A protein has these predicted regions:
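Short coil/turn segments at secondary-structure boundaries
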Residues: 220-224
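Active-site nucleophilic cysteine motif
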Residues: 225-230
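Intrinsically disordered, low-complexity
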Residues: 3-216
Length: 230
């Protein structure tokens, strides 16, 4: 992709995070704060949204990869961003990643009531009433699925390059503090039997595929410039 070519120095810069650590860590903290607010709402949904007889929850896990977030922001801002510049981006990404919906359904139910007639005799009747059910659904679209929808092809190239190298900052988001952060991965190589390579078409296909060994997985990517999703 665009960020992967050029001189060694240019290539290194093009695959590196160039923003200040304080801005990158600040953006991550701001996004995590939005997630914490969402989690608080879900944890206290019944008290924050009272008035229903029953609450039913279908909730995806709230999580994201900080390297994906930083790579998206870097690609959106030509490699360098400040925390102040990305506040709108963080809100936009959060709104696209997390879709919280509430739907209300009603059922007619019956409760038994005891009544007394004019002669003092008691009897029971089944009285209908409306039972309100609040269905709460949270979908985590996955932050890594968003780039294909919000980045240009050129920006996708830079995003893929950042994800391939983790911005040359594998120390920025250590797993101990950021359990969902990506970690550096070495390509897995498969030893192809020599007899299989006697097939010229197969050999040509393998030769072409080997050009892209090590390219990162990018959801929706379909070319060398955007990386690939399969």
């Amino acid at each position: 992709c665009t960020a992967m070519f050029g001189s060694t120095g240019t290539g290194l810069a093009a695959t590196s995070y160039l923003s200040e650590d304080s801005d990158m860590l600040g953006a991550e903290a701001a996004y995590a704060a939005l997630e914490a607010d969402l989690q608080h709402e879900l944890d206290n949904y019944e008290s924050l949204h009272p008035g229903y007889d029953e609450y039913r929850f279908d909730l995806d896990e709230i999580k994201h990869d900080p390297y994906v977030l930083t790579s998206i922001l870097s690609a959106l801002h030509n490699g360098v961003f400040t925390l102040g510049e990305v506040q709108g981006d963080l809100a936009m990404l959060f709104e696209k990643q997390y879709i919280l919906t509430q739907t209300i359904e009603t059922e007619t139910r019956y409760r038994t009531e005891t009544r007394t007639d004019s002669e003092g005799n008691t009897y029971t009747v089944e009285v209908p009433y409306t039972y309100y059910i609040c269905n709460v659904k949270l979908e985590n679209f996955d932050l890594s699925h968003l780039p294909i929808y919000i980045l240009t092809e050129e920006q996708m190239g830079f995003y893929a390059a950042y994800m391939q190298t983790l911005g040359n900052r594998p120390d920025l988001f250590p797993n101990g503090s950021y359990p969902h952060a990506s970690t550096p991965k070495e390509p897995t190589y498969y030893e192809i039997p020599p007899e299989a390579l006697k097939d010229e078409a197969f050999a040509a296909m393998i030769a072409e595929a080997e050009k892209y060994v090590g390219y990162p997985y990018v959801w929706g990517g379909s070319s060398p410039s955007t990386s690939f999703d399969c």
